[in-house]
């Protein structure tokens, strides 16, 4: 476990803990690690992002090493390992969206919100992130806000 100073320990609310325990039961004995992604989603729903304390907590629930959780949480762009705004705007930056002009959309959003890519607006409402493929290549440029796709952006 990574020790941090002045940070409150993370624990699921009773409702989320019950949900986590129910999710874990879907996997056979010895294969509970397979519940990692859904538990990370639960943790991020509760915290608003993925603090180290939440990753350590999930590792404890699954009886796995914290590094195993860190590897997964840092691999997927859907998990925010730094604090983010209330609304995260994720803009696809891969080939098809790039060819269709995502840069102009990204630059316009950043200018309007007064942030750089990866930054959060002064009021804490918006974070703009570039992400890898959102799997909507035929509808680019694409961005996602709160798990809702916005396609054919101009």
Label the model's feature ranges.
Residues 1-154:
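Signature of N-terminal electron-transfer/Fe-S-associated modules in redox systems
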